[in-house]
């Protein structure tokens, strides 16, 4: 199999990278109707598998789970989760031949084996669904021509997909039809019904492509969503402790600081996040973010280039073939860091203190979000896709750190995201550790910015620069569909 994207000519590559249309609410008037009365079989019962299945069943669909024989015989976690929630469970051979839609929600590294196992069992004219297009785009999986291949990609972890549905809402979602596999022209109808069944139509749906979803998803998770949070956590903790800050306080400031800071980002974009600072602190955060963007732009561009070319995917798949040697080593190294092993702080940190004492962290968020967005757009990805894969998902990932530090983030995200996270963080930490971190001033981290003097013209220009960044305009539009967003921060 060959990387699908690399088999396309330049015009085709650009067309698929740039495929992005924000769908109108009335396009989902039939909601999940197209799939009602049909059999949906989900392969895999992890976070996305279970929670999407629960939503689909509550939306009136006939949902069952196909698991490997050994998973059923040994009553593994996937079998227990499916049966405890009242779903029908069977082997591939028992359930796949009956399915109108087979939804593959296993980890990326298992996709080829799963697809090759289920394809011969699928009836003529059935549909195959994904929630991430890595197997189609990067692996280049060939699917039988009578099978329709679609994607519904919620832009949140599986737990959030369920919680938002239970609240009568949903999470923003990308949908796509593989152009090589839509023999009956029903792919979009299937994808729309599946998205509606998970509740995604209530929060906004983008009609995208497998290519655009994969390339933007990989870029977001490697850089701002995971890599920048990991690098920032390690750098900020070590800096605070080296300057005499109590390790427990430093740990709590960082662990819960990302979540508190990005809650403002979620509600009102970079503008609101920066507005939580005093005017002197805002000016300092802006200056630091501009420095960070200049230093890190080549690193962000390298990650985007390696994602576009397939270099990243080929490297990761080589590690799969080597029993995840690099991934497991990086995971072990992260577990040994001082931040991960710091004592817990029993005291209280107020919400505003996280902002006042986290000017550098705010600068890192601003720089990372803007760089990820700009780099994706410069590579042909449409602004709406770039927004969802940078700013939108950041509070959700920050929330995982608030639960159990970097360990929890790396457990919750996919192995693909975790691998890319380590690649980025392992380069970003030494890049920033020396000259930049050594140049920090009192008030950048762990203390409030001193002084009150502000130049009006400078403040005016900085405010205009923040509010006029393209991500703020597209964010304002997309957040209009998410007016019922719940508050997720739990800092204290």
From Swiss-Prot:
Pathway the protein acts in: Amino-acid biosynthesis; L-isoleucine biosynthesis; L-isoleucine from 2-oxobutanoate: step 2/4; Amino-acid biosynthesis; L-valine biosynthesis; L-valine from pyruvate: step 2/4
Binding of Mg(2+) 1, residues: 217, 221
GO terms under biological process: isoleucine biosynthetic process; L-valine biosynthetic process
Cofactor binding notes: Binds 2 magnesium ions per subunit.
SUPFAM superfamilies cross-referenced by the UniProt entry: 6-phosphogluconate dehydrogenase C-terminal domain-like (SSF48179), NAD(P)-binding Rossmann-fold domains (SSF51735)
Gene Ontology molecular function: any one: magnesium ion binding
Binding locations of NADP(+): 45-48, 68, 76, 78, 108-110, 158
Enzyme class: oxidoreductase
Segments forming domain KARI N-terminal Rossmann: 15-208
Coiled-coil zones: none
Domain KARI C-terminal knotted per the UniProt entry, residue ranges: 209-344, 345-485
Positions with a binding annotation for substrate: 414
Binding locations of Mg(2+) 2: 217, 389, 393
Keywords for the protein's UniProt record, in alphabetical order: Amino-acid biosynthesis, Branched-chain amino acid biosynthesis, Magnesium, Metal-binding, NADP, Oxidoreductase, Repeat
Active site, renumbered: 132
Domain of life: Bacteria
GO cellular component: cytosol
Cofactor: Mg(2+)
Entry's EC annotation: 1.1.1.86
Record field: catalytic activity: (2R)-2,3-dihydroxy-3-methylbutanoate + NADP(+) = (2S)-2-acetolactate + NADPH + H(+); (2R,3R)-2,3-dihydroxy-3-methylpentanoate + NADP(+) = (S)-2-ethyl-2-hydroxy-3-oxobutanoate + NADPH + H(+)
Annotated function: Involved in the biosynthesis of branched-chain amino acids (BCAA). Catalyzes an alkyl-migration followed by a ketol-acid reduction of (S)-2-acetolactate (S2AL) to yield (R)-2,3-dihydroxy-isovalerate. In the isomerase reaction, S2AL is rearranged via a Mg-dependent methyl migration to produce 3-hydroxy-3-methyl-2-ketobutyrate (HMKB). In the reductase reaction, this 2-ketoacid undergoes a metal-dependent reduction by NADPH to yield (R)-2,3-dihydroxy-isovalerate.
PANTHER family: KETOL-ACID REDUCTOISOMERASE, MITOCHONDRIAL (PTHR21371:SF1)
Family classification: Belongs to the ketol-acid reductoisomerase family.
Protein name: Ketol-acid reductoisomerase (NADP(+))
Originating species: Yersinia enterocolitica serotype O:8 / biotype 1B (strain NCTC 13174 / 8081)
């Amino acid at each position: 199999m060959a990387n699908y994207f690399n088999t396309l000519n330049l015009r085709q590559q650009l067309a698929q990278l740039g495929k992005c249309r924000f769908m109108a609410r009335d396009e989902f008037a039939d909601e999940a109707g197209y799939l009602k009365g049909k059999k949906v079989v989900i392969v895999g019962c992890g976070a996305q598998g279970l929670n999407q299945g629960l939503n689909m069943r509550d939306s009136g669909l006939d949902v069952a789970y196909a698991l490997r024989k050994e998973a059923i015989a040994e009553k593994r976690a996937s079998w227990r989760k499916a049966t405890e929630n009242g779903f029908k469970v069977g082997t591939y051979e028992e359930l796949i031949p009956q399915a109108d839609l087979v939804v593959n929600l296993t980890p990326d590294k298992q996709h080829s084996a799963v697809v090759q196992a289920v394809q011969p069992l699928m009836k003529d004219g059935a549909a195959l669904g994904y929630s991430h297009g890595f197997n189609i785009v990067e692996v280049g999986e060939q699917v039988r021509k009578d099978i329709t291949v679609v994607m519904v990609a919620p832009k949140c972890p599986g737990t959030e997909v369920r919680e938002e549905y239970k609240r009568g809402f949903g999470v923003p979602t990308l949908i796509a039809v593989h152009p090589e596999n839509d023999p009956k022209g029903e792919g979009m109808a299937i994808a729309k019904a599946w998205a509606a069944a998970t509740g995604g139509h209530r929060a906004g749906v983008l009609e995208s492509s497998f290519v655009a979803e994969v390339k933007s998803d990989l870029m977001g998770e490697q850089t701002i969503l995971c890599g920048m949070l990991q690098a920032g956590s390690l750098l900020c903790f070590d800096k605070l402790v080296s300057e005499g800050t109590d390790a427990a306080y430093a740990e709590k400031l960082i662990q819960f600081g990302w979540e508190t800071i990005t809650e403002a980002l979620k509600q009102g974009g970079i503008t609101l996040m920066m507005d939580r600072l005093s005017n002197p602190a805002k000016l300092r955060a802006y200056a630091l973010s501009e420095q960070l963007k200049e230093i890190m732009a080549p690193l962000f561009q390298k990650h985007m280039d390696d994602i576009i070319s397939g270099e990243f995917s080929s490297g990761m798949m080589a590690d799969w073939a080597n029993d995840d040697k690099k991934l497991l080593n990086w995971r072990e190294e992260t577990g040994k860091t001082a931040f991960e092993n710091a004592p817990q702080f029993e005291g209280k940190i107020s919400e505003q203190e996280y902002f006042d004492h986290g000017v550098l962290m705010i600068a890192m968020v601003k720089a990372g979000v803007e760089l990820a967005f700009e780099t994706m757009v410069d590579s042909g990805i449409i602004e709406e896709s770039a927004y969802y894969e940078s700013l939108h998902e950041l509070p959700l990932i920050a929330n995982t750190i608030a639960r159990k530090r970097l360990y929890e983030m790396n457990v919750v995200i996919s192995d693909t995201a975790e691998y890319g996270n380590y690649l980025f963080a392992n380069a970003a930490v030494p890049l920033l550790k020396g000259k930049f971190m050594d140049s920090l001033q009192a008030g950048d981290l762990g203390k409030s910015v001193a002084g009150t003097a502000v130049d009006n013209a400078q403040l005016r220009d900085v405010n205009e620069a923040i509010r006029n960044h393209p991500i703020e305009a597209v964010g304002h539009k997309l957040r209009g569909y998410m007016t019922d967003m719940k508050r997720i921060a739990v800092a204290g």
